Each structure stands twice: as structure tokens, then as C-alpha cells.
Swiss-Prot record:
The lineage of its organism: Eukaryota, Metazoa, Chordata, Craniata, Vertebrata. The keyword Cytoplasm applies. Keywords: Apoptosis, Cytoplasm, Phagocytosis, SH3-binding. A motif (SH3-binding) lies at residues 696-706. Its main location: cytoplasm. PANTHER family: ENGULFMENT AND CELL MOTILITY, ENGULFMENT AND CELL MOTILITY PROTEIN 3. Probably interacts directly with the SH3-domain of DOCK1 via its SH3-binding site. Part of a complex with DOCK1 and RAC1. Interacts with ADGRB3. This is Engulfment and cell motility protein 3. It is found in: Cytoplasm.
Length: 720
């Protein structure tokens, strides 16, 4: 006879004792269960004990989380969290260095448990740890353990980072600025200062004033990935918290100190693979670099500005200097103005007064900056572009100014200039760290590409929008390849000619037309169930392999990782925390389990409880797109297992796999693409023998029935 649903079979162990195998009744109060367990080992005062999960972070079991205990769970009997907190805090205040060190070693693994953390915090544990950190008597293991424990306790959000004292923050800053100490201390100190900077603007200003940028550069140049990542994290946090003017000064100084070259040579092109955290911080740094262009992009040209009028004249003279000098000599003011207006028209401005063209925002003054940069840094290419087009047949000239304005808008859209940084994105372009003035240099490549494509298309003024669509496609396809240098980008984008774009479009069109014939559609419909089963199998296999997820709180992007996978029999989701850089854990080492039978629904996007309170700002758009949750039964309550996918592809794979486990359709974009690819391949295989045989649009007509059904048989023929 099967046991009741609320009874689970578990093992409980204790040091120097024979483990107990019991049937735990989840309806029985936890205090009564503890009393029975203690009685079996002849232990008195059961209120002094508590149960913990034996695996992972040894979390304490309470009435709130006891539903996580499943059949086969292994628990251990340990000291109650309040008594354990008192003992460890007593050890921290002892005069014995060894006793303090041992207490810290026991405190660190328990600090991630909310129950234990509350007990420590309520007993002034943070103040005790803060005193140890401020005293700095031991710059080795004791300090490292103290910083780790302090950060773990603060991560629970029970105490605000804004409550930290200025002397404490300054002491942590000292550990960042010091040289002689244990190698594990600087990354922990940098991580703590990053949390302070992101959470408290006032303390963030203190950190910015106390931590020299040169010191962060020193940490970045140490060939230690963890130290480099933490230094880059603090650097991007300081940049994000700075005003636009301060941010520009900071970035200018960092570029003067060759940070860009160091990142390009020693981080991007490092022999060791780049971690996800570093990729995210490089994405943020790139977004902040491009964000410096936003004020110019949002500012229209001021027709009353003497400086801007002079810049326009410089642009005109760089193209028509000889012609202007020879033809303008001795002319009246009206004739000279008429000549200038005609030359601005030749430059490709739509109006004789170029200020009217540059009043549009975006791109505003950024388009003028790009044109000036091109004329000054590639004068021969600039003159050739303008003079070549001004001498072409009417309506066939490529308008330089109009093309520059539209190209600047296009580049701002492709590179998302001025958009808020995503909390999870890792999509940076190595090319931007390999070149000074990368945006302007990219414009120089793009404007010459525009002229080249214009000639290939033999375009007229009426074809301007069509040409810009082709140029957008050329630039977008090449940027997606993530070229590592501007020269490589130039080579690849010039190889993508208009003819190649047409070929790609024709291939896509023929592919689409070939798959829309009625017989092909019927064949595809017959193949769909089998191929959907294949996709379902692949999704479940991917879940069995497991994925490393990153924990993200409502406050900031965190460094903690956890691993989740599906058991081989597809009956359990197993998960647990792990350190970055560690090898994938085995199923046996994952402490948490969620039976598939207990899963009720899959939630995505803003419906997920862990992103519901984060607001609706643009900066959270990417977070919503990667968030999903599983609701499941935990006793009489509904609980959630929350995920933030590391990428859009992982989001699709996991939501598809979980939908398959729940018996729901797999409706992701990735499933549609995979199904389309499989259908195309399978259809082509089925039609190999029909090459050069036309496939009719309609099936052959069914012949009319005979006039009668009087069939004739020759009965004289003997059957064999």
C-alpha cells in the first residue's frame, strides 16, 4: 500500500551517530518531528536543535520551506540557528586569532541562508564583522573571510547598503588601494565597493573620490580573471553613477592611459575564454562610450552659432576650395552667397541653407561631426566623393550631405546610441575596442560603402530610400559577424556587394516560393508531427544537459550562479548553487529537487514574480525577455522557481522544454525556426528524384465515374 501523499521517506544523520531512516509526516509540526528525532538519539532540549539539508549550502528547514523535502532527501541534525549564531559571534569576539578564524570558516557557508542571516544580523553580527574589517589586524584569510561573510549577509537585503558608515567604506577602499595582502582580498573588496556604488549614490561618490582610476587600471593589468572582472565591474559602476560630464572626463582619462588597447589585446584576445560577467561589463563600457554621442545626436544645428556656420564653410571649402577661390574672386556679396548656396547644393544638402537639413534630431550635430571627421581624416576620399557626384548626370549623383545625415541615423539605430544599458546583455563588438574614434571611423567606411552601392545600383534621387535599405542590410549583416577590427569590417562589408545582396534576396524568395506550392504544403503538414517530436526530444535532452543561470535581484545584477538540469528519467528538476568557473556538477551533488508532477504552469516575462516589481522602464526590457518561472505546489501554498536565461536562445530552449514537460505546445520563435529548417531539409530529401520535374499547382483532376458499374469478368480463365 502506497504511503499518504504528505508522508516522505528521508534519512537524518548526525555526527558520530547512526543515521535514522524515518517517514516524515509533513502535516506534523516541525517541533514535534525534532522531538522524535532527538529522542531516538537520547538528546534532551530538542529546541536547541534544527534540521538542515545535508547537501549544498546546508539551508535550515523551517515550516515555510519544509515542502522542499522530497522522498530520498538526506537531512542532518545541527545546532539551532539562533544558538549557532550566538556561538559563532562569540568566537568572532574571542581574543584567540585561531578561534576567530575557525568561527569565520563556519560562518561563511551559513551566511547565504536567510534564516541564519537574520539571527546573525539581529545579534549585531554585521557590526562585529565590520569591526574586524575596520581593524584589519590580519590581512590574510581572516580579512578575506570577513569580507565574504559581510557581503553574503548584506545580499539578503535585510539591511540597506546606505546604512554603511563612511569610515567602514574608506577602510574597504584602503584594501583596494593597498599592495601587500592576500590575493583573495582585493576581488572581495572590489565586489563590496561595487555593491555600495550601485546601491547608494552618496557612498558611490565617496568611492569615486577615494579609488583612483589608476588603481583600477593596476588591478585590470594583473593576469587574474577574477580580479580583472571585479575591477571592471567597479569601473563600470562608477561610470554609470557619474554625471555625463564626469563620465566623459573619466573615459577620456582612461583612453589616455591606454585602457582601450589593453582591453583589446589582453582581455578580448586573451588565451583564456572570456567569462559572461566580463562580457557584460564590456558591453556596458561600449554602451557608455557610445552614449557620449547622445548630446550631439539630440542637439539641432543653431543657425545663429558662429562656430557651426564656420564648420559648414570648412566642409564646403574642403570640397570646392580651388573652384571657389578661382570663381569667387572679385564677386559681389550677393553673387558670393549665390555661389555658396550652389556649392552646398552640390554637397548634397536638400536646401540652399544647410542649417535647415541639420535641424532634424536625431542625428542633429552628430551628422555634421561625422562629415567634418571624414573631410579631415580622409580628404582625398571626401573630395573624390563630392566632385565625382557633382559631375555626374543630373539625378544620378549620390547626395553626400543627405546620405551622411541618413547614414548617421542608421548607425545610431544599429548601435543603439542613447538607449539604456541592459542588465544582462553581453553583445559587445570587439571592433570598438580596437580603434580610436570608432563611431566616426565606422561612418567613414559606411559613407564610402553608400557611394559604392549607389553606383552598383545605378541609382537616381528617387532610389535614395532603396539604396539606404541595402546599405542598412550590408552594415547589419557585417556587424552581426562581430569583426575584430575595422579593417576586417571594411573587407567584409565591401565584399557584400549589391549583387550579393540581390543573390541572397533571390535565394530567400525562391526558397519561399518553392515551399508554398500546394503539394509541398501538404507534404510539410504530414511531416510536422514527426519533426515536432524530434524537436521535443532535443529540448528535453538540452534540459538534461543543464544550464548555468545567474541570479538577479530587484536591486542589481548579482554574481551568484546556480545550475539546473532535468533528470534522465524526466521526472525531476534538480538544481543548486555553484561557483563561477567550476565544472558542471553531477546530479548527485545538486541539493534541490522539484518533481515534474508538482509543476503547474510556466510563466514568462512580466508575469514572473521575480521581475514583477522591477517597474516598466526601458532598462528592464531585456530582463523581461529572458525571465521565466515555474509555479508548483509546495504543500498548500503555490511557490515559484525563478529563472533568468543567459541568452535568448537558452530562454527559448528552456521554455520549450518545460512546456513539453507540462504537455503544452512549444510556441517559441526558436521552435518555429528549427521546424522550418527541418521541414526544408526533409522536403528537399523527399523531392530529390523530382529535380527538373515541374510540380503542378493543383493535383490532377479526378476522372468522372463510368456510366455504369456492370463490370465484366472472363470466368473461363482458370485461377492459378
Amino acid at each position: 500500500m502506497a504511503p499518504p501523499r504528505n508522508v516522505v521517506k528521508i534519512a537524518i544523520k548526525m555526527r558520530d551517530a547512526i543515521p535514522q531512516l524515518i517517514q516524515l509526516d509533513q502535516a506534523k509540526p516541525l517541533a514535534a518531528v525534532l522531538k522524535e528525532v532527538c529522542d531516538a538519539w537520547s538528546l534532551t532540549h530538542s529546541e536547541r536543535y534544527a534540521l538542515q539539508f545535508a547537501d549544498g549550502h546546508r539551508r535550515y528547514i523551517t515550516e515555510n520551506n519544509r515542502a522542499e523535502i522530497k522522498n530520498g532527501s538526506i537531512l542532518c541534525l545541527s545546532t539551532a540557528p539562533d544558538l549557532e549564531a550566538e556561538q559563532l559571534l562569540g568566537g568572532l569576539q574571542s581574543n584567540s586569532p585561531e578561534g576567530r578564524r575557525e568561527a569565520l570558516r563556519r560562518l561563511v557557508p551559513l551566511a547565504s541562508d536567510m534564516i541564519f542571516a537574520r539571527e546573525v544580523i539581529s545579534r549585531n553580527g554585521l557590526q562585529i564583522l565590520g569591526t574586524i574589517i575596520e581593524d584589519g589586524d590580519d590581512l590574510g584569510e581572516v580579512l578575506a573571510l570577513s569580507l565574504r561573510a559581510f557581503s553574503e549577509l548584506m545580499e539578503h537585503g535585510v539591511v540597506s547598503w546606505e546604512t554603511l558608515s563612511i569610515p567602514f567604506v574608506r577602510k574597504v577602499v584602503c584594501y583596494v588601494n593597498m599592495n601587500l595582502m592576500d590575493a583573495s582580498v582585493p576581488p572581495l573588496a572590489l565586489g563590496l565597493l561595487e555593491s555600495v556604488t550601485l546601491s547608494s549614490p552618496a557612498l558611490g561618490q565617496l568611492v569615486k573620490s577615494e579609488v583612483p582610476l589608476d588603481r583600477l587600471l593596476v588591478h585590470l593589468q594583473v593576469m587574474n580573471q577574477q580580479l580583472q572582472t571585479k575591477a571592471m565591474a567597479l569601473l563600470t559602476a562608477l561610470l554609470q553613477g557619474a554625471s555625463p560630464v564626469e563620465r566623459k572626463h573619466m573615459l577620456d582619462y582612461l583612453w589616455q592611459r591606454n585602457l582601450r588597447q589593453f582591453i583589446y589585446k589582453n582581455i578580448i584576445h586573451s588565451a583564456a575564454p572570456m567569462g559572461d560577467e566580463m562580457a557584460h561589463h564590456l558591453y556596458v563600457l561600449q554602451a557608455l562610450m557610445l552614449g557620449l554621442l547622445e548630446p550631439r545626436m539630440r542637439t539641432p544645428l543653431d543657425p545663429y552659432s558662429q562656430e557651426q556656420r564656420e564648420q559648414l564653410q570648412v566642409l564646403r571649402q574642403a570640397a570646392f576650395e580651388v573652384e571657389g577661390e578661382s570663381s569667387g574672386a572679385g564677386l559681389s556679396a550677393d553673387r558670393r552667397r549665390s555661389l555658396c548656396a550652389r556649392e552646398f547644393r552640390k554637397l548634397g544638402f536638400s536646401n540652399s541653407n544647410p542649417a535647415q537639413d541639420l535641424e532634424r534630431v536625431p542625428p542633429g550635430l552628430l551628422a555634421l561631426d561625422n562629415m567634418l571627421y571624414f573631410s579631415r581624416n580622409a580628404p582625398s576620399a571626401y573630395s573624390r566623393f563630392v566632385l565625382e557626384n557633382s559631375s555626374r548626370e543630373d539625378k544620378h549623383e549620390c547626395p553626400f550631405a543627405r546620405g551622411s545625415i541618413q547614414l548617421t541615423v542608421l548607425l545610431c539605430e544599429l548601435l543603439r546610441v542613447g538607449e539604456p544599458c541592459s542588465e544582462t546583455a553581453q553583445d559587445f563588438s570587439p571592433m570598438f575596442f580596437g580603434q580610436d574614434q570608432s563611431f566616426h571611423e565606422l561612418f567613414c567606411v559606411g559613407i564610402q560603402l553608400l557611394n559604392k552601392t549607389w553606383k552598383e545600383m545605378r541609382a537616381t534621387q528617387e532610389d535614395f530610400d532603396k539604396v539606404m535599405q541595402v546599405v542598412r542590410e550590408q552594415l547589419a549583416r557585417t556587424l552581426a559577424l562581430k569583426p575584430t577590427s575595422l579593417e576586417l569590417f571594411r573587407t567584409k562589408v565591401n565584399a557584400l556587394t549589391y549583387g550579393e545582396v540581390l543573390r541572397l534576396r533571390q535565394t530567400e524568395r525562391l526558397h519561399q516560393e518553392g515551399t508554398l506550392a500546394p503539394p509541398i504544403l501538404e507534404l510539410r503538414e504530414k511531416l510536422k508531427p514527426e519533426l515536432m517530436g524530434l524537436i521535443r526530444q532535443q529540448r528535453l535532452l538540452r534540459l538534461c544537459e543543464g544550464t548555468l543561470f545567474r541570479k538577479i535581484s530587484s536591486r542589481r545584477r548579482q554574481d551568484k550562479l546556480w545550475f539546473c538540469c532535468l533528470s534522465p528519467n524526466h521526472k525531476l528538476l534538480q538544481y543548486g548553487d555553484m561557483e563561477e568557473g567550476a565544472s558542471p556538477p553531477t546530479l548527485e551533488s545538486l541539493p534541490e529537487q522539484l518533481p515534474v508532477a508538482d509543476m503547474r504552469a510556466l510563466l514568462t516575462g512580466k508575469d514572473c514574480p521575480h521581475v514583477r516589481e522591477k517597474g516598466s522602464g526601458k532598462q528592464n526590457k531585456d530582463l523581461y525577455e529572458l525571465a521565466f518561472s515555474i509555479s508548483y505546489d509546495r504543500g498548500e501554498e503555490e511557490a515559484y522557481l525563478n529563472f533568468i536565461a543567459p541568452s535568448k536562445r537558452e530562454f527559448y530552449l528552456w521554455t520549450d522544454g518545460l512546456s513539453a514537460l507540462l504537455g503544452s505546445p512549444m510556441g517559441s520563435e526558436q521552435t518555429r525556426l528549427d521546424l522550418e529548417q527541418l521541414l526544408t531539409m526533409e522536403t528537399k530529401l523527399r523531392l530529390l528524384e523530382l529535380e527538373n520535374v515541374p510540380i503542378p499547382e493543383r493535383p490532377p483532376p479526378v476522372p468522372p465515374p463510368p456510366t455504369n458499374f456492370n463490370f465484366c469478368y472472363d470466368c473461363s480463365i482458370a485461377e492459378p
